[in-house]
């Protein structure tokens, strides 16, 4: 009995849960960016994409933001796209944070948690590396650092 309760209580990882799997098509993301523009992940087909679930109240999220800005510029010739999905924090705080860091990529609001649920997010930050064909290649739970970015990006950067 105790083992059954312990198994139910253990933390989930994205690979433990049905509905999303490395090697499968990434779930659709259709929504509105914080600046009011419509967004559809399908419009980025043909580009390597990083989908990052974040919020300005999350310290590791704040710490990885400069890395995403740096890598987006470094891989511009590859067509790299970054998409933020705002989790839990309010849009006004997120807009101020984005302006402070000079982030140029779109952030989509997820007020109902539908996107978070489709991606089986277990915490923030959490990043999904999607190849040019819309296939999920890697999932990173926790802060993406310089030391792991190269491997994660290599999984989606080949034509």
Regions found by a protein language model. Give the residues of each.
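A short beta-strand-turn-helix
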Residues: 20, 28-49, 72
């Amino acid at each position: 009995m105790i083992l059954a309760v312990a198994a139910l209580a253990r933390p989930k990882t994205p690979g433990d849960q049905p509905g999303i799997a490395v090697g499968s098509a990434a779930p659709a993301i259709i929504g509105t960016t914080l600046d009011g523009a419509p967004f559809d992940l399908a419009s980025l087909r043909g580009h390597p994409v990083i989908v990052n679930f974040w919020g300005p109240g999350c310290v590791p999220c704040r710490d990885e933001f400069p890395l995403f800005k740096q890598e987006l510029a470094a891989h511009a010739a590859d067509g790299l796209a970054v998409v933020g999905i705002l989790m839990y924090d309010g849009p006004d705080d997120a807009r101020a944070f984005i302006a402070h860091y000079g982030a140029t990529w779109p952030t989509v609001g997820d007020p109902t948690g539908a996107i978070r649920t489709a991606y089986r997010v277990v915490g923030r930050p959490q990043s999904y590396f999607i190849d040019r064909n819309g296939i999920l290649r890697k999932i990173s739970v926790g802060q993406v650092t310089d030391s792991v970015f190269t491997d994660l990006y290599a999984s989606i950067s080949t034509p």
